[in-house]
Amino acid sequence: MHGFCGRLLHVDLGSGRAGYRDLDERRLRACLGGIGLGTSLLHEYAPPGVDPLSKDNPLIFTSAPLVGTSITTTAKFAVVTKSPLTGFIADSLSSSHFALELKRLGVDALVVTGEAPDFVYLSIDNDTVAIRDARHLEGKTSVETQTRVRAEVGGAWVASIGVAGEKRVRFATISNEGRHAGRGGVGAVMGAKKLKAIALRGSRETSVAHPRELDAFAAILRRRSLGPVTDKYRTIGTVANLGVFNRLGTLPTRNFQQATFDEADAISGEVLTENHFSRRHGCASCTIQCERLFTSQAGEQRLEYETLFALGSLCGISDPECVLEAAGLCDRYGLDTISTGGTIAWAMETADKGLLPEAHALGLRFGEGAGVLAAIHAIGAREGAGALLAEGSRRASMAVGGGSDAWAMHVKGLELPGYDPRSLKTMALGLAVSPRGACHNRSGAYEADFSGAVDRFHGDAARGGVVAASEDYAAVLDSLIVCKFLRKCFVDFYADAAEVLSRVTGWDCTGAELRSAGERIHTLKKLFNIRERWQPEDDWLPERLLRDTLPTGVAKGVALTPEELRDMVRGYYRAREWDERGFVPAAKTDALGIEDLSNGNVGTQKLPHNLESPRNRTLTPL
């Protein structure tokens, strides 16, 4: 088999056993790798109704067919599980050397189940698997953990959790090399298993069916990746978005009370670059090198737009030193910066309204940087008011009451990213219907709004088709896996991607086949959520966005009405060929071949696998 390895490794931390299992080529072709394969496996390994923080919730790491090839930006891996924040699917991506080592193990997926009695780390060196004591790593930051584990196992690449993951903060991340599988609380799931880290070292190369032809196409993509379509990412990086969005009236400010920030210039990408720039960096196997590291009194720190908005304008913070320090704290604790900023901003407003007196001990007020820093410490350690905030804005607002859910800015429990959707109507729909919750990465629906392809101030039912198409497109990118910053380097994405996949695998793949794969993958996500008690009211936006008009900026006076959103959601369901309430009919699952993907086991419990069956091989006793 080319491109894929045709097997997964299943490790059960409770029994201390591990074994391989074959993966059918039909499933791999139908779901690809990455998030597609991970979603398919989640249906199979997660018992219906499983508690996300229980031992039975699987933590699934997946590779993809393009990982380890000459195609730029493909050193990526996916993490898929049931989210402790939303109760629905959590799928997250991260990058760099850990991704390459996962593929070099000769597996397409690593499935971790069970719970260790004490904190451990998992060490995998090709076919040798060991569970090692990690009690000496408790309380260590993710960076400290990775450094220590690499020293102990001799240079492997490591992914780990910080203290937030140990404490099961519901938006804890899994970190590797300064990057994060960031959203949905995957780090809390890892912490609940008492798994502090995973160290990988492999030696297998990715088999490519037509290496010369692939290398020729890879060279074209590399040249395009250094051209004008990626110029923004290669010059200032994603922090450039803050100033742009402020001018467009889409920059979330003071917990979405405004969409412009009067002090945006103080933390703009241009000012950060002029006063704090340290160096440019990038993931392994990437020519774009979009990362920017900035210096502050607290040290050197990576910073992306989503972190800048969440810890900056969303909380009314205009001090770049404070934003950089806050970002560094989130990295060390292992916290999703979007959910951290969103939850803190909710707490600031709630305290302003006199409903959260314990927040005053942290100094939580809009514009007060010391309060943000204190809150991050409290959340990461689950101490004081941080114990409540560690639950995320949805659960915190339910506990506090007093109508505070009206300004808890989440969808399905996942805090909103850095786009005010009242003046981005396609984006509004994309956020509402996303299986992941409030997410900009699983559709990129904002592109239609920003490009002028549609009227961003007015929504209509036709946006449903736009969002559905963008979700399927993103699903293919996330399952091959290719960085979204490379997307515009493809002239005809589906045709070009099919050609790349054919050269890697030897299949005769078409663009139409990849389109169907994207729809299949997205539908699998939806089906998992339905299995986990999704209801139509979950595809909705926070009350504030449907009640308040934008008060400032070029979008002043623009509103998003419930009727407008309802019309777009219904149009989306029609575009998807789902029923009028958003449930997937059997005819659609049959047309996509979903029920056949895992021998009829999609949506059924298959835990634990018999690791000693003829299809599996028990490894070195653990």
Question: Can you describe what each PLM-predicted range is?
Answer:
Residues 1-234, 240-258, 396:
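Protein-protein interaction/assembly regions in multi-subunit complexes
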Residues 94-98, 342, 603:
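Solvent-exposed, well-ordered amphipathic alpha-helical segments
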Residues 150-184, 190-602, 611:
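Extended C-terminal regions of large enzymes
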Residues 603-605, 612-618:
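Charged/polar low-complexity intrinsically disordered segments
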